[in-house]
């Protein structure tokens, strides 16, 4: 964690996941102190519903936002294609669309997730470079 460019903390809308996410964030904060550097981190909402947002998830998101925790803007939606991909291996693109429902939506979701992570990494790099320049000007 101490040398990571980005720490993603997966979170389902479950009480136990919420508690574990808090523990993970606390670990990141301890590592920040130990390494004397900011460690970019964000919560990734997983296995969410494409149709509705549960009360539990809304409450968890509100609590995280109130605590200033960054949440990745893309959620990994609960889809059978993700389960099949993990069970059978290979790639999402290789799944048989006749046997597995929602493959195209899962691919779209996975691409949006990847793009969000790349964007966050770029933003973090730009912030780090700006901080380095600002720190160098005071010397």
Language-model features: locations:
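Structural beta-sheet core signal
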Residues: 9, 43-45
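Short histidine/acidic/glycine/proline-rich micro-motifs that form metal-
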Residues: 13-15, 47-51, 100
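Conserved C-terminal guanine-recognition region of P-loop GTPase G domains, centered on the G4
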Residues: 18-37, 46
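Beta-strand-loop-alpha "switch" segments that mediate conformational coupling across diverse proteins
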Residues: 49-52, 60-93
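Inter-lobe coupling/hinge region of RecA-like P-loop helicase motors
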Residues: 85-111
